[in-house]
Amino acid sequence: MGATFWIVTYLGLDIGGSKCRYEWWPTGFAGGGVAEPVHPAVDVDLAAKLADLLLGIATPAPSAAVVAMAGVDAHAKAALREQLPGHGVTFPVAIVEDTVAAAAAAGLYDEPGIVIGSGTGSFASARGADGQLARVGGRGYAFSDEGSGYDLVRKAIVAALHALDGRGRETLLTDLLTDAFDAREPQRLGGVVQRLRPREVAGRLPVLLDAYARDDWVAADVLQNGMYQLTQLGMAAWKKVAGSVQPDVRVAYGGGVLEHNEVIRDGLERTMQASFGGQLLMLSLSSSAAAEAAARLAGGWHQGDEADTEWVERVSL
């Protein structure tokens, strides 16, 4: 009888507001992919749904997994780890904030710099030369998440309604957004949108970009303000760990809004460099980077690596 070999593999999940990305480590064992997300703010019986997600992805089961999840606090992390085995998850699972995986993907694990994320939500994190970490923003779509897909579309809707009421400049956005959200008339736009999930609102970002491409000044103003807000997040995070802004800082950025929209990405780079007073070392993160970082952290955590264990169990951003 031939020998049986046990392949040690680790799984990383990056669960944002719009989708879940998963990757394996070591790379090449199995392909990564995208699944429907779960979210603490909107999903009832979160542990059962997360278990279903893990078990649906993890075939065969990994040696361990790290789940990076938006909107999870310390209580939720502890509760999920305790409840997952009762739903059939037999391998060790650690829960971290999605900002932790993004910071690791951006190299803040061991080097100073900034990471800015803009997807359905937004945030910025920074690491100083002394290892101090800070997070700014990412406090939820109702009161934070400036420069995110949701925020940009929300502000476009506000501008469209102001134009309708005669309180703002006329804009193509009024008709374009009314059609995009299947509202019967522009006056009903606000009521229709309020019934939707944040990711459904953020998904209409192409409408804003379409208006911008047609030289709509209101759309341009909304986008410019969003780039400025993201820059402010990055500056605030950096000041928390470095005291002041200066050129030559390493800045990584990612999330669906920045990854897939060149006009926003290029505008952010220009705004950041102007605000920091010179050239920055700008790095675009792929859509899989945070999930890949989570998978690597799972490996180190499971094997008892001190630095990885610190990030998984004690770093909070």
What is each PLM-predicted segment?
Residues 95-98, 285:
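Short, conserved loop-to-beta-strand elements that form functional interface hotspots
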Residues 38, 55-95, 105-108, 250:
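Short beta-strand-loop/turn "lid" adjacent to the catalytic site in phosphate-handling enzymes
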Residues 66-73, 118-120, 249-260:
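Glycine-rich beta-strand-to-loop/alpha-helix junction loops that act as flexible
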Residues 85-91, 132-140, 272-280:
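Glycine/charged-rich beta-loop-alpha catalytic/anionic-binding loops adjacent to active sites
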Residues 110-167:
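Glycine-rich phosphate-binding loop of actin/hexokinase-like ATP-binding domains
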